[in-house]
């Protein structure tokens, strides 16, 4: 292999190619074995390279992965950013280049701290360092934990580890398997190549575990409204009431549902502007013994703006009244979409930095469950569903469902909304709670507590998804402990590998 890769450009080019094909492991392609093959090849390419060289190789792997895997971001920048194509491509290049720094850091740390070809390097250090750099990517500058390798395994046997340690545990196991294969190939210890078989077989066996129990005596009939409102028209004043009446008409046909759910910011107006309409909607819902959950925009007395969710109809609060303390307010805001860092500098530069509804304030990190028709919903608005610890910290023993409202119309007919749905499915599996996802134009769907899609609407069509969903009782290990055991393992594994490295010297 070294002879094939002896030319100084071969390893970086090979890494870039492997990075490019890595997104095929994720939705909509879901060729999940690539999520094991890709880091395995990357580890081989890093072998016997200087730390500086390893950083370059891993950086190009990251460039390939993110240039393809998050290409959908450019759809939003190019379509709604109001800037020349060259400028939108430049911004996209900056984003991809930034995200690739994290794989680069992994490569540098691995070969700087562990230059030898040892078993502890491949089986302990590599998985630990990968997880550390993933965590950093999910935290720095509000975080962007998209394309974590574990998400690709939602339909593989490894998915059954999610209720134990979340998506991070799956990522850790992928790197553990990749490291064992790298060690086997580099040292001709072929027995080590059996480790992935054992790990996947264990995952398959875990399918029999029943972490939670369906409450068959309690079922909720739901109607999810997919309005399919064109993003370019959504915030035009002339389209406000046509949009609201479209959702109202679709709702009127489905008052037999326990809970009717509209998507994120389905009502393109501030709540205080349409209080009469909401009073009427509340009265109609209560008359039909139903409840409506909808996304809406709010403004507080001190002129702070919130991306909110409200419930009307059969709720514990009685008749509708304008009270912001009884709303869910989005906590994790999307940079440049819902708030603009350094806005005094950036907003004058281009329309992209001055999009509609891009001056929001944060809600609280932990908020009460929304109650509708006696069911408790943990809410995550759009981007928030990718932050697993935030969702987990809002779940209580009384939570019935995970609810995520979104508007992915920003990203057109790209792979982004399908990746988004894949991530949402993982939240259901981790926490053992059915997930309800209502969107403007897809993917609108309902999953069971194992993240399996039970019902789904076609994308880019107006429609109503009717489904009966059963809540669960009980707790998964991940709900009880979160990622704390993984933090401990990473610290111990990295420390052990470093100790072995020093001892070998």
Curated annotation (Swiss-Prot):
Protein origin, superkingdom: Bacteria
Keywords, comma-separated and alphabetical: Acyltransferase, Cell inner membrane, Cell membrane, Membrane, Transferase, Transmembrane, Transmembrane helix
Alphabetized SUPFAM superfamilies for the sequence: Carbon-nitrogen hydrolase
Transmembrane segments annotated in the record for this chain: 15-46, 55-75, 89-109, 129-149, 161-181, 192-212, 479-499
Protein's pathway: Protein modification; lipoprotein biosynthesis (N-acyl transfer)
Purpose: Catalyzes the phospholipid dependent N-acylation of the N-terminal cysteine of apolipoprotein, the last step in lipoprotein maturation.
CDD domains noted in UniProt: ALP_N-acyl_transferase (cd07571)
EC category: transferase
Subcellular location(s) of the protein: Cell inner membrane
Protein name: Apolipoprotein N-acyltransferase
InterPro entries listed in its UniProt record: Apolipo_AcylTrfase (IPR004563), C-N_Hydrolase (IPR003010), C-N_Hydrolase_sf (IPR036526), LNT_N (IPR045378)
Gene Ontology MF terms: N-acyltransferase activity
Membrane topology: Multi-pass membrane protein
Active site per UniProt: 264, 330, 382
PANTHER family in alphabetical order: APOLIPOPROTEIN N-ACYLTRANSFERASE
EC number: 2.3.1.269
Organism this protein belongs to: Vibrio cholerae serotype O1 (strain ATCC 39315 / El Tor Inaba N16961)
Family of this protein: Belongs to the CN hydrolase family. Apolipoprotein N-acyltransferase subfamily.
Residue span(s) of domain CN hydrolase: 225-471
């Amino acid at each position: 292999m070294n002879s094939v890769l002896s030319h100084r450009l071969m390893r970086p080019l090979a890494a870039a190619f492997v990075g490019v094909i890595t997104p095929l492991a994720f939705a909509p392609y879901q060729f999940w074995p690539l999520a094991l093959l890709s880091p395995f090849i990357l580890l081989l390419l890093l072998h016997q390279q200087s730390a500086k060289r390893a950083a370059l190789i891993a950086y190009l792997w990251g460039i390939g992965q993110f240039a393809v895997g998050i290409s959908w971001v450019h759809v939003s920048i190019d379509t709604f950013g109001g800037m020349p194509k060259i400028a939108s491509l430049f911004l996209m290049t900056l984003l991809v280049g930034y995200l690739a720094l994290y794989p680069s850091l992994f490569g540098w740390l691995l070969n700087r701290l562990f230059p030898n070809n040892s078993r502890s390097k491949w089986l302990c250090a590599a998985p630990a360092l990968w997880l550390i750099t993933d965590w950093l990517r999910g935290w720095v500058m509000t975080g962007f934990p998209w394309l974590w390798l574990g998400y690709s395994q939602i339909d593989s046997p490894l998915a059954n580890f999610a209720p134990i340690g979340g998506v991070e545990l799956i990522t850790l196991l992928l790197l553990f398997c990749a490291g064992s294969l790298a060690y086997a190939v580099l040292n001709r210890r072929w027995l080590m190549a059996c480790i992935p078989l054992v790990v996947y077989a264990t995952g398959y066996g875990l399918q029999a575990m029943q972490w939670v129990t369906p409450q068959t005596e309690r079922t909720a009939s739901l109607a999810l409204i997919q309005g399919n409102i064109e993003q370019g028209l959504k915030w035009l004043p002339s389209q406000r009431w046509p949009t609201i009446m479209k959702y109202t008409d679709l709702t009127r046909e489905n008052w037999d549902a326990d809970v009717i759910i509209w998507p994120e910011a389905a009502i393109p107006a501030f709540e205080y502007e349409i209080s009469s309409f909401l009073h009427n909607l509340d009265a109609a819902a209560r008359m039909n013994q139903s409840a409506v959950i909808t996304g809406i925009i709010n403004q507080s007395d001190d002129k702070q703006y919130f991306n909110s969710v409200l419930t009307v109809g059969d709720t514990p609060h009685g008749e509708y009244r304008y009270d912001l303390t009884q709303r869910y307010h989005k906590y994790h805001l999307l940079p440049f979409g819902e708030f603009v860092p350094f806005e005094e500098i950036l907003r004058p530069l281009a329309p992209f930095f001055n999009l509609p509804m891009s001056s929001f304030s944060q809600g609280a990190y932990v908020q009460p469950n929304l109650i509708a028709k006696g069911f408790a919903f943990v809410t995550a608005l759009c981007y928030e569903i990718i932050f697993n610890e935030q969702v987990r910290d809002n779940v209580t023993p009384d939570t019935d469902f995970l609810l995520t409202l979104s508007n992915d119309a920003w990203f057109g007919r790209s792979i982004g909304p399908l990746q988004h749905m894949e991530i949402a499915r993982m939240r259901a599996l981790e926490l053992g709670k059915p997930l309800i996802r209502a969107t403007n134009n897809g993917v609108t769907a309902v999953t069971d507590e194992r993240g399996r899609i039970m019902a789904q609407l076609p994308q880019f069509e107006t429609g109503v998804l009717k489904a009966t969903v059963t809540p669960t009782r009980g707790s998964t290990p991940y709900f009880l402990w979160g990622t704390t055991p993984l933090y401990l393992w990473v610290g111990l594994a990295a420390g052990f590998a470093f100790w072995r490295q020093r001892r070998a010297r």
